[in-house]
Amino acid sequence: MEKSSIYGLTWTNLTEWLEAHGQKKFRATQVWDWLYRKRVKTFEEMSNVPKETIELLTANFVMNTLEEQVVQESTDGTTKYLFKLSDGNLIETVMMKQEYGLSVCVTTQVGCNIGCTFCASGLLKKSRDLTAGEIVEQIMNVQHYLDGRNLEERVSHVVVMGIGEPFDNYDNVMDFLRVINHDKGLAIGARHITVSTSGLAPRIIDFANEDFQVNLAISLHAPNNELRTSIMRINKTYSIEKLMEAIHYYVNKTNRRITFEYIMLKGVNDHKKEALELAALLGEHRHLAYVNLIPYNPVDEHIDYERSTKEDVLAFYDTLKKNGINCVIRREHGTDIDAACGQLRSKQIKRVGVRERMKQKQAAAEE
């Protein structure tokens, strides 16, 4: 039997599992204290947990399914991690130092099928969803990295914006949120957590009905169907009209602000025309709409795209502001490392592929 990650169990899951296996309910409190407060790396270190319980946990669960492969540190404090999963797949995680604390961007899938033409993540198609445990472990590995350097710093914010579409892995992402938000877990405040979606309208409605105060971000990137479909394949399934219907439901249900992410592509979506269209699109909910203008990180494989000029970004920003839309230009992180989402993973897979082809050629030559 393949063991699963202990980090994938919510508080309710762990409590019920322990009781079903003849253990006292309060053991869950002890185990979570060791996992998330003391942050031990083995079950054997849980000194106040009975040997019987330790043996039971060891027989059924593991604590470390991610293996650190590459760590890139930027001069601005951003750190990018490449992890290998137990099946050999690679994923990325990013830690960013902000004025308000330490923020970690997590991956939710191995690859991505959404098909955004400007994104490095979509170059390698989705092979599987991550488990809740694999998502939680990204946070824990970053925290262990900090602990190991005797840095008295704690992950305080989480953005679910890494490789993959979070709402295409909905159940595992929800369990992940329940673990990191729980007061006996990592206790990261709901309002310090943001989940981003490319626009899976039915899941936005589901998310509105969850008992969470977690922030929602929409990867919009275009204000009309023709343009959005040309750069985001998901728009063929969920048009802007369907997306806005779901957003209308979310806003009315939660009365919470939504962030709209808008990547600035030179000559594609950065004209005054698009800025005015965007302002009109968000007008009904302008009091709860917040636009995040994102400078494009060029990706080698996407030679058709360039980042908008600073002048065009500022002009776009000014047009939105003049039309009553709250917006900000995102501060860039890790510009001196593989900053674009999916870029480090893509490069590593290429390197491995080249090495394997060289080995095959060498073996063939020796035969």
UniProtKB/Swiss-Prot annotation:
It comes from the Bacteria. S-adenosyl-L-methionine binds at residues 164-165, 196, 219-221, 297. Keywords: 4Fe-4S, Cytoplasm, Disulfide bond, Iron, Iron-sulfur, Metal-binding, Methyltransferase, rRNA processing, S-adenosyl-L-methionine, Transferase, tRNA processing. Transmembrane segments: none annotated. It is found in: Cytoplasm. Residues 98-326 form the Radical SAM core domain. The keyword Magnesium does not apply. It holds the Pfam family RlmN_N. Its main location: cytoplasm. Gene3D superfamilies: 1.10.150.530, Aldolase class I (3.20.20.70). InterPro entries: Aldolase_TIM, Methyltransferase_A, RlmN_N, RNA_MTrfase_RlmN, rRNA_lsu_MTrfase_RlmN/Cfr, rSAM. The keyword Cell division does not apply. The active site is at 92 (proton acceptor), 341 (s-methylcysteine intermediate). GO terms for molecular function: 4 iron, 4 sulfur cluster binding; metal ion binding; rRNA (adenine(2503)-C2-)-methyltransferase activity; rRNA binding; tRNA (adenine(37)-C2)-methyltransferase activity; tRNA binding. One of its GO terms (biological process) is tRNA methylation. Disulfide bonds join 105-341. It is an enzyme of class 2 (transferase). GO terms for cellular component: cytoplasm. Reaction proceeds by a ping-pong mechanism involving intermediate methylation of a conserved cysteine residue. This is Probable dual-specificity RNA methyltransferase RlmN. The lineage of its organism: Bacteria, Bacillati, Bacillota, Bacilli, Bacillales.
